[in-house]
From Swiss-Prot:
This is Small ribosomal subunit protein uS11. The keyword Lipoprotein does not apply. GO terms for cellular component: ribonucleoprotein complex; ribosome. It comes from Pasteurella multocida (strain Pm70). One of its GO terms (biological process) is translation.
């Protein structure tokens, strides 16, 4: 008995006007994730995934390229306003925000959500070069 062909349904792109850009800027890499207000990820990009390897991953330019790649994908959702949450001490903090602003998003507010311990775990020992 022949099976009837299964037709793939067209995926409906959801329209999102407001979003949140989560920027994780570590010393070695920068991760940009853009979500909707509920926290569902719409797109993400990293400096390493954008073609930068080794010490070039940890540059502000690599973070800027990652933000631009993420912004391209999210434009299809109709995103207009962004709230930015920055975490970490890395070199890509400021350049990522500038790139998102230059991509045409209206940045409503910028929040620093870097976790600061109230004397929690012992930090790693200092480097001796």
């Amino acid at each position: 008995m022949a099976k009837t062909p299964v037709r793939a349904r067209k995926r409906v792109k959801k329209q999102v006007v407001d979003g949140v850009a989560h920027i994780h800027a570590s010393f070695n890499n920068t991760i940009v994730t853009i979500t909707d207000r509920q926290g569902n990820a719409l797109a993400w990009a990293t400096a390493g995934g954008s073609g930068f390897r080794g010490s070039r991953k940890s540059t502000p330019f690599a973070a800027q390229v990652a933000a631009e790649r993420c912004a391209e994908v999210v434009k299809e959702f109709g995103l207009k306003n962004l709230e930015v949450m920055v975490k970490g001490p890395g070199p890509g903090r400021e350049s990522t925000i500038r790139a998102l602003n230059a991509a045409g998003f209206r940045i409503t507010n910028i929040t620093d959500v870097t976790p600061i311990p109230h004397n929690g775990c012992r930090p790693p020992k200092k480097r001796r070069v």
